[in-house]
């Protein structure tokens, strides 16, 4: 087997520097597509004999040499020779895919937009979540209920020209109550009228009576806070006077504390009496 060829292309990674006088390869034909292009002659430098070899055509495309340290020898002049006993040729086989992937057809932008428009239209028409029964508005159901109730239970009104006779004992308290509490009566009538007109679904606005009760509760809470602050200040003054040994300061703080308590106690009974009086009047008016 010859190792160096002239006029032939191989994929061997070994680079050699040869002299034409010692290694001459005579190709029989210059064409690489004929069978004779794979036949060559070479001379062995050790024995000087000419040997003929046949090179595989697969070496041109995917063949390569497998070399070791014993596969080549070097001369004093730098020439490299290969030994056939320590050299082998291997080939790479190209694997061919039998099962190929099917290419998906590329969809155009217009088709994508049309699909999107169809999906949006289905959402709008309600074809995605179809309802078994159409939803009727609440107002129509209330109207049907009212009509059916009127048909089933007829209502008749009668007018009685005779006015009820009121006793003279009950007239003055009623007038007095009307003069004293006109605001609460107006609040009640206003609430009743708003409830009858607006209906069950509407929320009536807050009345003046509720606002007055809220104002009284806020006043009581502010008075409680003020009392707590005064008690804290007086206790601090007493503690400072006792710790410092200043008797006059302690006596003055105690006197101020007693005066404040008495003033608060005097102011509270009047308001409590008024509240009790109003409460008793409400109870009597309801009983009558």
From Swiss-Prot:
Signal sequence annotation: none
Topology in membrane: Multi-pass membrane protein
Compartments, record wording: Membrane
Protein name (Swiss-Prot/TrEMBL): Transmembrane protein 71
GO cellular component annotations of the record: membrane
Designated gene of the protein: tmem71
Coiled-coil features, chain-numbered ranges: none
Major localisation: membrane
Highest classification ranks of the organism: Eukaryota, Metazoa, Chordata, Craniata, Vertebrata
Family named by the database record: Belongs to the TMEM71 family.
Classification via InterPro entries: TMEM71 (IPR027975)
Keyword terms: Membrane, Transmembrane, Transmembrane helix
Record field: transmembrane: 229-249, 250-270
One Pfam family recorded for the sequence: TMEM71
